[in-house]
Design a protein with these regions (language model features):
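Flexible active-site lid/hinge loop adjacent to a nucleotide/diphosphate
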Residues: 1-59, 193
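Short glycine/proline-enriched loop/turn "hinge" motifs that connect secondary-structure elements
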Residues: 1-5, 85, 204
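Short, acidic/turn-prone active-site loops that include or flank metal/cofactor-
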Residues: 13-17, 69-72, 218, 290
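Glycine/Thr-rich phosphate-binding loops of Rossmann-like dinucleotide-binding domains
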Residues: 19-20, 54-55, 74, 222, ...
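Adenine nucleotide phosphate-binding catalytic loops in nucleotide-utilizing enzymes
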Residues: 21-31, 35, 42-43, 58-169
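Short, polar loop motifs at secondary-structure junctions
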Residues: 48-52, 69-70, 272
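ATP-dependent carboxylate-amine ligase
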Residues: 61, 98, 121-131, 135, ...
Length: 303
């Protein structure tokens, strides 16, 4: 991107990542590379609440606009609350500063408030009306990222791409803030991948979920049960409760048929993907389609 002058540069947060022999030598070098954006943009829009914001802005040449839920900023959020109604989750909050309004977003989690604020601020700076911003925000969804499917007013069904310990802990922590009656996880593990990741996935889901339904993900060249046996090592560490249903659609159907009011069912690992990779072949499989088919079958009395 050298030589390109951006209209806006955005900073939301920074954590140690992409550090290693083939990437960045240190966190400091990683942050320095990120900070270059604010020397080649006209306006920098930054999260004033992130502990690394000063490092990111070191040497900046742009005009700076800030957003925050904790301190004075160009755009501020307050009175943050959770939406949990008719099987739909989200956040609502008040906005002051360069905008003055009430906002809501149907993506659960506190991080959604920050993502909403930066979106609102950039759109406001670009001259978009407050009404259009709020309408767009109320309708936004991100495919495969805490994506809710409208299945029932009694329970919530969510698709998320989380497929390692860090991302899984993050999404489950977010959902636990909504106080589900039961948190049920449906997932497997990727074949030809680290066993350590499987142990960790089993341990964190066993710790945080009320029930884990082990099933097929992308087994690739491995057997589903071999992969899930590794996951069970982690489940044993956290004394997690589980069942095994190899067919992913059948695993989802089991959870939907046995859901109780207030339950949250989380389909982990596939997210935006629309296939399963088995023995070198990619078979079409979209969880959204599978859920719709199961609903139709349940209505027709076939399940």
């Amino acid at each position: 991107t050298a030589g390109i002058l951006f209209d806006y540069g955005i900073f939301t947060n920074l954590s140690p990542d992409h550090i290693g022999p083939a990437e960045h030598a240190s966190f400091e070098e990683y942050m320095e590379c990120k900070s270059l954006l604010f020397r080649q943009c006209k306006i920098g829009v930054v999260n004033a609440d992130d502990e690394h914001v000063d490092g990111i802005l070191k040497g900046h040449t742009c005009e700076v606009k800030t957003f925050s839920a904790e301190r004075e900023a160009d755009l501020m959020a307050s009175d943050i609350g959770f939406i949990n109604e008719d099987g739909k989750l989200g956040m609502h909050f008040n906005v002051t500063g360069c905008m003055d309004c009430q906002a809501k977003v149907h993506i659960p989690g506190r991080f959604s408030v920050y993502n909403s604020m930066v979106t609102m601020l950039v759109c406001h700076l670009a001259g978009i009306s407050d009404e259009a911003i709020l309408e767009g925000l109320s309708k936004v969804q991100v495919k495969g990222r805490v994506e809710m499917l409208p299945v029932s007013k009694d329970y919530t069904l969510i698709i998320d791409y989380a497929h390692n310990e860090v991302s899984t802990r993050s999404v489950l922590t977010t959902l636990m803030e909504y106080h589900p009656k039961r948190l049920i996880c449906v997932y497997g593990g990727g074949g030809n991948r680290s066993k350590l990741r499987r142990y960790d996935m089993g341990e964190v889901t066993g710790e945080m979920a009320d029930l884990c339904v082990l099933t097929c993900d992308n087994p690739r060249d491995e057997e589903i049960r071999d992969i899930n046996n590794d996951i069970k090592v982690g489940l044993a560490r956290s004394n997690g409760k589980y069942i095994e249903i190899d067919d992913r659609k059948e695993a989802i159907a089991y959870c939907m048929k046995n859901a109780k009011p207030g339950d949250m069912i989380v389909l982990l690992g596939k997210g935006h993907e629309d296939y399963q990779e088995i023995k070198g072949v990619k078979y079409h499989f979209d969880e959204r389609e599978a859920v719709a088919e199961i609903l139709d079958e349940m209505k027709a009395g076939k399940r």
